[in-house]
Amino acid sequence: MKVRNLFFTVAALSAICTQAVTFECGGLYYTTTGANTVAVARVPAEKATNNPYKGVYIIPEQVYYDGANYQVTAIADSAFFQSKATEVQVPNTATTIGECAFAYATDLANITLPLHLKDVSKMLLAGTNVVNVAVPEGVKTIGWGAFQSCPMLHTMLLPSTTKRIDAYGYNNCHNLFEIYCAAPTAPEASGWAIFIGLSGIDVIVPDDDAVAKYAANAVWGDESTFTLYPSEEVSISMTGEVEKYNEHYMRFALGNNLAYKIYKGDELIALTAADFYYVPITAEGAEYYIVPTNMMNDAEATKVVIAPSAVKNVTDDRDLPTVYGRDGSIYIHGNTYGEMVTVFDMYGRLCFRRATNGDEVITLDRGIYVVLVGNHPTKVRL
């Protein structure tokens, strides 16, 4: 009996230790979903009245809390429901976005979905004011009511992996003008009221063979709703305009009712149909390529270079940060807002990394660390 009671005690303690924790970081709330993972969460009810989500959100890939780094792998159900967010850029570390995550956020006009998103969930962007939306490759299903009642929705860009659009998918989207669908065969769209009452929608598909397949489909072949066209070459010239958004980010001006593939060097980092895409300001600078696309054909790339000079330089010893260790924590003071803070242990392992919002307190285990604030290194012993 004592052994059995001990078992239940250990199990109960284990459950307590693994209980999800919600915390705030950089203006967003997160809930732990695993030992090193979090989901963006809705503003807690007791704080929602005075501190709702509003404005632009560039969600980071990683956040730091209570001595540990957490990877952002999801957006929770209803996280931005009825919020005042205007633009949201979701990081590629997120693979799932919950039901109603952005539903009825009526100020939301721009969204960048992550490259590794599994599916477009139920009511994902219902009731928002998004104008153009690109869905990344790999997504198979557009969920129930995902874009229902989006009055400003003009252009949808769907990947070659699209297999199904569920009921009410585009119900009441009366300004939907064009759908670019890279799927070679018509996605199943047999649910109720997916396109009911809509008309004058141009559907652009990969080629003439795909046009024939879509035309033979009971839904996509409805000439009172759709006109089918094969994809053509994309020809658009871009200025490569880039502007400083704030101390942390530069942004590319996009638009034109198309999608854009964004490369950092040779690495694809985004597919978006938003008006803007945000990239971090770093001391090293970076080279980007912007490629307009309709999901089937790409235009020529435009090269954009973010020079290291975009980063504030230290010009006076008084601008150098103060970094020291005390009572198990690293303290950083000074003119550091927007600087990238990186901490390595004595073996070169990364322990902490994020752009600072000002003074920083980092709690770590006992040991020797190298703290890099921008380009300024300091050795600290805890």
Give names to the regions the model predicted.
Residues D77-S78, G98-A101, S121-L124, G143-A146, ...:
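Consensus positions within tandem repeat domains that build extended binding/scaffold surfaces
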Residues A35, V242-R251, G255, V323-I332:
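Short coil/turn motif common to extracellular beta-sandwich-like domains
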Residues T33-N36, N50-A74, S83-T96, T106-D119, ...:
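Structural signature of tandem-repeat unit edges
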Residues A259-A273, I281-M296, K303-L382:
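C-terminal outer-membrane/trafficking sorting elements
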Residues M1-T22:
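Sec-dependent, cleavable N-terminal signal peptides
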Residues E232-G255, E300-P308:
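Pro/Thr/Ser/Gly-rich low-complexity, intrinsically disordered linker/stalk tracts
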Residues P206, A253-N257, N335-Y337:
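Short glycine/proline-centered coil/turn motifs in the loop regions
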Residues T22-A48:
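GGW-centered surface loops in extracellular recognition modules
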